[in-house]
Amino acid sequence: MQVLSEQEVERRKDREELMKLGINPYPAEAFPINVTSEDIHRNYENRKLDYKDIKIAGRLMSRRIMGSASFGEIQDASGRLQFYIRRDDICPSEDKTLYNTVFKKLLGIGDFLGLKGYIFTTQTGEISLHVTEMTLLSKSVKPLPTVKRDDEGNVYDGFTDPEMRYRQRYVDLTVNPEVKNTFVTRSKIISQMRRYFDDNGWLEVETPILQAVHGGAAARPFGTHHNTLDMPLFLRIANELYLKRLIVGGFDGVYEFGKMFRNEGMDRTHNPEFTSMEIYVAYKDYIWMMEMVEELIEQVTEKIHGKTEIPVGDKMINFAGPYRRLTMYDSIKEYAGIDVSELDESGLREACQKLAIAVDETMGRGRLVDEIFGAKVEANLIQPTYITDYPIEMTPLAKKHRTSPGLVERFELFVNGKEIANAYTELNDPIDQRERFEEQLKLAARGDDEAMAMDDDFLRALEYGMPPSSGLGIGIDRLTMLLTNKTTIQEVLFFPQMRPEKKQVDLSEEEKMIFELLKLESPVALADLKVKVELSGKKWDVAMKGLTGKGVTKEIKEGDAITVSLVD
């Protein structure tokens, strides 16, 4: 049964009262708006005659009742607008119910209103709407958090708890307008990138999200099962291999913005569902791709911010090209002080041990090099930097380096210590590609759960011939973090993945006593806990059974000893 707060109970009563007055709290009719608050604030002073008959809709966000007249604020998708409402204007007849009862008593903060009237300037110079007609469009039965701002813009009692904000993004967007700006910027970033690609004549495409073979990246997939076909399928970890099939099919350039899924950990820069852009262009190599990426990101930054140097945390990042280029081996030599270029797997394990880097037996040479790089190099790459020329074991889909044996033509772009982009000169030799896949199968047999699977259909496509090509992947979420100066990926995702929400549990007085003791020490010996609680045998048994049944505590038996702990 739903437990309602006092305000929620009152709002439901207000809803019933509105219906008794013949007012539908949720009317079906459209309300044809003809202006936004942003338009009014931007253009009113120069186009006053255009705002004599306007219709605007949005949430009621504040209200100051002063007898037969009141001021308030309405918030639409673009911002807020003050309005002035008089009883006799919206109630020209003798019946003053709409103002005296509906507006003053039955409306609440968060209700959606449709207002009609004209714009004027108050004596204090504030652009405002003089309301002549008011329509209730939707009644809110749950109160919004109260966010108070002083004259200097300081926020008090704000809706600021990160977990609540991410779970209830709909509330976050309503009461924290700067959050909406982040997502508007995200949309603009994607639009600018798409425009750049289209201007170059490359085709936007769509490829399968459900795939029979999880390929194109080193990551753990999410698996599912197709009942009709009776076969396992995977949510894609990358779209690379399908895009390359289209290059085989004759397209000179294809790109895709899409969701990828990786069944891995969550942290400040990782979400199991994320957005990536991948592009493949025929007759190009990774050197050309570096120049293209510089031009792309420089243009996007300029369009979004009007400049190429922007703050990221406490640093200033300059996205104007050209970017620094450093080979992977040289970067490890510079920041870790060791030359790994000639080390075999055994030597790399010794190096990891000396550097206090944890590794396991499933890791081959490429993974070991990558572990050293991640631990000792990444955090130092603040300004945009290309790390190039990776060990062949790390990248089974990239072409062998044209001059350096044992390496492949690959680069990753790092900014502020994080990888933003990944690109190759694409491997188009089907024999070499098959051998690389076979090496991946050997790693999988050793227990490497990030090893790639064999994709026979992709190999068949390569056998028909693929032109020399270069491919690129950019993490849209991380790029957005940079260009909006956000420190966590959750801030740039409307609905990030969250752990299951813990439900509030009602506890008896005896259960609360035990719970409070376990908050101080958990786990604890069952016998010791019983002594501390000092409950009678029956009350103790009922309370412990209740806590276990509600999922609050668990008992662990080891031999003759029994301990009690809180459930995480």
Language-model segments: residues:
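Short acidic, hydrophobic short linear motifs in intrinsically disordered regions
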Residues: P523-V533
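Hydrophobic residues on short alpha-helical segments
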Residues: E511-L518
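Short amphipathic alpha-helical interaction segments
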Residues: L535-G549
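Alpha-helix C-caps/helix-loop-beta hinges
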Residues: K116, N200, E521, K550-G551
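Class II aminoacyl-tRNA synthetase catalytic cores and aaRS-like
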Residues: M1-V505
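Short, cationic-aromatic polyanion-contact patches
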Residues: Q504-E511, A525, E555-D568
